[in-house]
Design a protein with these regions (language model features):
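Intrinsically disordered regulatory linkers and targeting segments
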Residues: 1-350, 438, 442-521, 527, ...
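Short, contiguous acidic and Ser/Thr-rich linear segments
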Residues: 540-556
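Conserved, well-structured core segments
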Residues: 301-303, 355-363, 414, 468-469, ...
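Eukaryotic mixed-charge, acidic/polar low-complexity intrinsically disordered regions
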Residues: 582-617
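Eukaryotic basic, amphipathic alpha-helical target segments in cytosolic regions
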Residues: 288, 292, 308-316, 338-342, ...
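Alpha-helical bundle/repeat cores within regulatory domains of eukaryotic proteins
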Residues: 377-378, 390-464
Length: 617
C-alpha cells in the first residue's frame, strides 16, 4: 500500500526524474496495484498471445486486410474500393503501402518458391525504376501541395495514378490554414507530413519536440481548432464513414511511426475459448449483443455502466478510491452473485461497497478475453511510450483511438470520463491524475508471455504516462481530425467515378439520362446558388428553403425551425433535441456542430441533402 505522500503526489510528477520522491511514491502505487492483481490470480488468459508465431507474410496480410487493401494480395487489378483508396493516399502513405505489399510478395515467393504477385503490378512502377520508384516531383505543384506521381506502364492495362492527398481545394479546406503554436494542434494535414525532421534523421530539429518535451513539469494545454466546417466527433459520423476512417488511420499511423523511426508491431490473436454468456470473461461484442436484447442501442456493457454509476454515486469523494482494494473474499462473492443475478435484476447493489465496486470494475477490464485496447493494437499503444514529445504521443493516440472497434472505443471513453471525475475530486479522495494513471495502467496494459515481468518493469512509467494523456486529452482524442474527414470525402468521390468499361459507361449514362428527365422539372424550379432546402420530418413544417451567407450557422437553422414550428402540434419542449445533418454527396452522414458555417459545407459538399433530426442513440 502506498504512503500518504503518494496520495498527495502531484500529477505533474516527471517520468524522467527518478530522483523525485513524488515519482518514486507514484511508482509504488503502480507496483502495489500489480501485486493486488497477482494476488487475485485473475490475469487475462495467456493463450491469447502467440508472440513470434506470425511470419512476415502473415503480418503483412493482417495489416493489408485491416487497411482495406486485401485485394492487393491476389486477384486481378480492378476499380474497386482498394484502388479508390490507393488513389487518395499521400506520397508517404503510398510508399508505406508499397513497402508492405513488396514485403508480402517477397516473403510469399520465398515460402512457396513460385511466382507471386509483384509489387510493381500494384503500383505500376516501370522496370527502369525498380531501384528508385519515386519519380521526380513536378515543380508545378498547385497551392503548395505535393503533386500526383506520374505513373506509366508498358502493359495495355493502366492503373490509376496515386496522387497525393489534399482537401478538395476547388471548394474549401476542412480546416483553416495551420498556425500551430505550443498550445494548438493542427488537424489540417496528416500527422506524418508534419514530422519531416524525424524522417530525415534530425530529431533535434523537430519543432514539435523542441516546443514540448516529455520531462516538462506540466502537460501542455492544447486547444481544439475551430474550423468553419465545424468540429466532428466520432459519434457524428456514419458507421460506413468511420470504417473508412479506420482504414486511413491505420495507413497514416504506420506512416507516422515510420517517420518517427518506430517499427509498428502487431500481436497475433489465437483462438480463445471465450464465454458466450455471463459477465466476466465475455467479449465486449457478445456482452453488447446480449444487452441490446434488454436495452436496445446500448453501446457500453450494462454491468460496466452500473459499476461506474455505483462508484460515481458513493465513491468519488472516498479517500483512496481505486487505490484501496476491497475485501478479496467479498469481491469474489459479489462476482459470483453478479454472474447469477444481474440479468435477472435480482442483484442487490446496496450491499456493494465502493472499494468492492472498484475491484469489480478493474477485474472486469482485466478479464476481458481480448484487451480493451485490442490485442492487435496493444503494441502500437505501447510504442507511443518511446515517442519523444507529448505532441507526437497525442497524435499517435489520436490515430489509435480512430482505429479501435466501436465497442472498445465506447467502453474506453466511459472509463476515461469516470476517471476524469475521480481526478476532479482530488482534494477529497486524495487521488491525483498521476495516482489514478498509475493504478489504471496495469489493468489496461497487460503484459503476457515468458518476458512479461521484464516488459512490465520497463514499460511501467510509460504506460502510466499514456493513461494520463488519455484522461487529460480525451475530448481531443474523440474528435475526428479534419484531414481524415477530407480524406474520406475524396475517397467517396473516387469511389463514385464512372468505371472505365465502355459497356458500363453506356449503362451509367443511360441511367443518368433517365434520372435527369425525372428531376428536370424540379431542377428548373428548384434552388438558386447559395440556397439549401432543409428537410425536418418531425416538424410541422417539414421543409424549408434557406438562403446562406457567410455567417449562417447550423444553430441558426435549428433555431429558425423551432421558431417557425412553435405553434405546431408538438411543443418544442416535448420534441427531442434535433441537429442538422449533411447526408450524401461525398459523405455518408455527418451531424453538424452547431457552430458550423453552412456556406462552407455547401461549397465542400454541394450535392448533399440537409436533414434536421435527433441523433441516433
Amino acid at each position: 500500500m502506498s504512503s500518504r505522500g503518494a496520495r498527495l503526489s502531484s500529477p505533474s510528477s516527471s517520468l524522467e526524474r527518478p530522483a523525485s520522491q513524488d515519482s518514486q511514491d507514484s511508482m509504488e502505487d503502480y507496483w502495489s496495484e500489480v501485486k493486488n492483481i497477482e494476488e487475485d490470480g485473475e490475469r487475462a488468459h495467456e493463450d491469447l498471445l502467440e508472440r513470434g508465431s506470425m511470419d512476415e507474410a502473415e503480418l503483412e496480410e493482417a495489416w493489408l486486410q485491416e487497411a482495406g487493401l486485401s485485394t492487393l494480395m491476389s486477384g486481378e487489378l480492378g476499380e474497386g474500393p482498394a484502388e479508390a483508396l490507393l488513389s487518395t493516399l499521400t506520397r508517404s502513405q503510398a510508399a508505406m503501402v508499397k513497402k508492405r505489399v513488396d514485403n508480402y510478395t517477397l516473403t510469399m515467393r520465398k515460402r512457396n518458391k513460385q511466382p507471386a504477385r509483384h509489387v510493381q503490378d500494384v503500383f505500376s512502377t516501370p522496370d527502369t525504376l525498380l531501384v528508385d520508384p519515386i519519380l521526380p516531383v513536378s515543380p508545378k505543384s498547385p497551392n503548395g501541395h505535393m503533386p500526383s506521381r506520374c505513373i506509366h506502364r508498358t502493359s495495355s492495362r493502366v492503373r490509376p495514378a496515386f496522387p497525393s492527398f489534399s482537401p478538395v481545394e476547388r471548394r474549401v479546406s476542412e480546416c483553416p490554414p495551420p498556425q500551430e503554436t505550443s498550445d494548438t494542434l493542427s488537424f489540417q494535414v496528416p500527422y506524418s507530413e508534419g514530422v519531416t525532421a524525424h524522417r530525415r534523421g534530425r530529431q533535434g530539429d523537430c519543432q514539435d519536440c523542441q516546443l514540448i518535451r516529455r520531462d516538462d513539469p506540466d502537460l501542455p494545454t492544447f486547444q481544439l481548432p475551430r474550423p468553419k466546417l465545424g468540429l466532428t466527433h466520432i459519434q457524428d459520423l456514419s458507421c460506413e464513414d468511420m470504417k473508412k476512417i479506420g482504414y486511413i488511420s491505420l495507413i497514416e499511423l504506420t506512416t507516422f511511426y515510420d517517420c518517427l523511426g518506430i517499427e509498428l508491431k502487431r500481436n497475433r490473436a489465437a483462438r480463445s475459448k471465450a464465454r458466450e454468456s455471463g459477465i466476466f470473461g465475455v467479449p465486449l461484442t457478445t456482452l453488447l449483443e446480449n444487452d441490446q436484447k434488454k436495452c436496445p442501442g446500448s453501446k457500453v456493457p450494462l454491468v460496466f455502466r452500473k459499476l461506474l454509476s455505483k462508484l460515481e454515486q458513493t465513491g468519488l469523494q472516498t479517500e483512496g478510491i481505486l487505490r484501496v482494494p476491497g475485501s478479496a473474499s467479498r469481491v469474489k462473492h459479489l462476482r459470483q452473485e453478479l454472474e447469477q443475478k444481474f440479468y435477472e435484476e435480482r442483484f442487490d447493489w446496496e450491499q456493494v461497497r465502493h472499494n468492492d465496486a472498484a475491484g469489480l470494475l478493474k477485474m472486469f477490464i482485466r478479464e476481458l478475453p481480448y484487451p480493451l485496447l485490442t490485442l492487435q493494437h496493444l503494441p502500437a499503444f505501447a510504442a507511443a511510450q518511446s515517442v519523444s514529445s507529448p505532441r507526437h504521443q497525442i497524435q499517435a493516440l489520436h490515430l489509435l483511438i480512430m482505429l479501435l472497434p466501436e465497442p472498445n472505443r465506447d467502453t474506453l471513453k466511459a472509463l476515461l470520463e469516470f476517471l476524469r471525475k475521480v481526478v476532479a475530486y482530488e482534494e477529497k479522495n486524495r487521488m491525483s491524475l498521476w495516482n489514478v494513471s498509475m493504478i489504471v495502467a496495469p489493468n489496461l496494459f497487460t503484459y503476457r508471455g515468458k518476458n512479461a515481468k521484464q516488459e512490465e518493469m520497463q514499460g511501467a512509467a510509460g504506460a502510466a504516462h499514456l493513461v494520463r494523456l488519455l484522461i487529460t486529452y480525451q475530448e481531443l482524442l474523440w474528435t475526428v481530425p479534419c484531414f481524415l474527414i477530407s480524406h474520406v470525402r475524396k475517397l467517396n468521390e473516387a469511389s463514385k467515378k464512372p468505371p472505365s468499361s465502355e459497356k458500363t459507361k453506356r449503362k451509367l449514362l443511360l441511367m443518368r439520362k433517365r434520372n435527369a428527365e425525372k428531376t428536370e422539372r424540379s431542377e428548373l424550379t428548384d434552388l438558386r446558388e447559395g440556397v439549401i432546402r432543409v428537410h425536418a420530418p418531425l416538424h410541422a413544417k417539414i421543409s424549408m428553403a434557406i438562403q446562406l451567407d457567410n455567417e449562417t450557422k447550423a444553430k441558426d437553422v435549428t433555431a429558425r425551425f423551432d421558431y417557425e414550428n412553435g405553434r405546431g402540434s408538438r411543443s418544442t419542449s416535448q420534441r427531442p433535441v434535433q441537429y442538422l445533418f449533411e447526408v450524401g454527396g461525398n459523405i455518408g452522414e455527418r451531424c453538424l456542430d452547431p457552430e458550423t458555417h453552412l456556406l462552407d459545407v455547401y461549397h465542400v459538399n454541394p450535392h448533399c441533402e440537409w436533414l434536421l433530426k435527433p441523433k441516433t442513440t
